[in-house]
């Protein structure tokens, strides 16, 4: 009799939990609406929708087509909890790429965390510029230097474009280099990662290409930078030394005199407000140099040839 009662109680509890789960479970469409309602102060409606799809793929393992056809389907309590946690973190301003732990750059996946800058579309334009300008050198045994490598997205992309090149990458941050090495291992490319303070250190090699997207934001521009960027991405990778906004470009120009081969190239991403000033640093060092605009028509790159 006691055994029967126990079985009945267990069955009742099981049935009750299923009933509660059905009452309080959310549909995929309700999650979609929640993304819009909770994040509208930080993102546009289109961005909210895109974030919804990104995290549906991550949590539910569904693509956009599947999601749209299953909007009225309920999700489990565990998945509901996962979505609510993500929305809460997004509301704090944390970039979604850091929540995912990955992003895409130039068509390839890269791991990212709070120790590296999240690669920007403008930097993809820099890679495209290099690939187009130096397409005739793709099979050559080049020596390439990437200054301030961060996640390694530039150096790894170039190692894939120039498979016979010897690529070296400098960064002051050991934690950033750990992520860069993880990305290099993932893409099965060999990069010579060097931890040093580039501004005070010396170079030992002579290179065919020097490329950099260094810290170039003036500390006086801090208030212009979005909360999510300055509070969640490494400031050391964003802001130039105080009162020396062109410090990295000055050092690269100096190194181009003795550590860039004759006929070698320089490719730099720059502060759009300091295009002419940055270009001027290289006009006496390189035989050819020019200021190149990005797709938004901002002065974004300085490129040149020795």
Language-model features: where?
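Alpha-helical elements of Rossmann-like donor-binding domains used by nucleotide-donor carbohydrate transfer enzymes
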Residues: 34, 54, 82-85, 125, ...
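S-adenosylmethionine
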Residues: 164-165, 172-306
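SAM-dependent Rossmann-like transferase core, predominantly class I methyltransferases
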Residues: 84-162, 167, 172-182, 303
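N-terminal auxiliary segments of SAM/dcSAM-dependent transferases
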Residues: 23-100
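Short, positively charged and aromatic/hydrophobic N-terminal segments
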Residues: 15-22
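Glycine-rich, flexible loop/turn motifs
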Residues: 63, 71, 92-96, 101, ...
């Amino acid at each position: 009799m006691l055994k029967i009662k126990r079985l009945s109680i267990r069955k009742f509890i099981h049935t009750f939990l299923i009933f509660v789960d059905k009452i309080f479970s959310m549909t995929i469409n309700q999650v979609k609406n929640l993304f819009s309602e909770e994040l509208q102060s930080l993102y546009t409606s289109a961005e909210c929708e895109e974030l919804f799809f990104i995290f549906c793929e991550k949590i539910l393992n569904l693509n956009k087509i599947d999601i749209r056809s299953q909007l009225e389907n309920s999700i489990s309590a565990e998945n509901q909890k996962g979505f609510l946690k993500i929305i809460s973190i997004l509301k704090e301003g944390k970039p979604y790429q850091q929540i995912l732990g990955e992003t895409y750059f130039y068509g390839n996946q890269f791991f990212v965390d709070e120790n590296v800058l999240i690669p920007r579309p403008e930097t993809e334009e820099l890679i495209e510029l290099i690939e187009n300008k130096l397409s005739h050198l793709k099979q050559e045994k080049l020596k390439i230097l990437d200054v301030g490598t961060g996640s390694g997205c530039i150096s790894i992309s170039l190692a894939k474009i120039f498979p016979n090149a010897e690529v070296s990458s400098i960064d002051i941050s050991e934690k950033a280099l750990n992520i860069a090495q993880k990305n290099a291992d993932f893409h099965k490319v060999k990069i010579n990662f060097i931890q040093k303070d580039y501004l005070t250190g010396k170079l030992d090699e002579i290179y065919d290409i020097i490329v950099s997207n260094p810290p170039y934001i003036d500390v006086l521009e801090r208030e212009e930078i979005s909360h999510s960027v300055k509070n969640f991405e490494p400031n050391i990778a964003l802001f130039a030394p105080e009162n020396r906004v062109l410090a990295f470009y000055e050092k690269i120009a100096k190194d181009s005199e003795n550590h860039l081969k004759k006929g070698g190239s320089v490719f730099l991403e720059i502060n759009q407000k300091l295009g002419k000033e940055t270009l001027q640093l290289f006009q006496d060092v390189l035989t050819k140099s020019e200021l190149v605009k990005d797709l938004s028509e901002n002065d974004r790159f300085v490129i040149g040839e020795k």
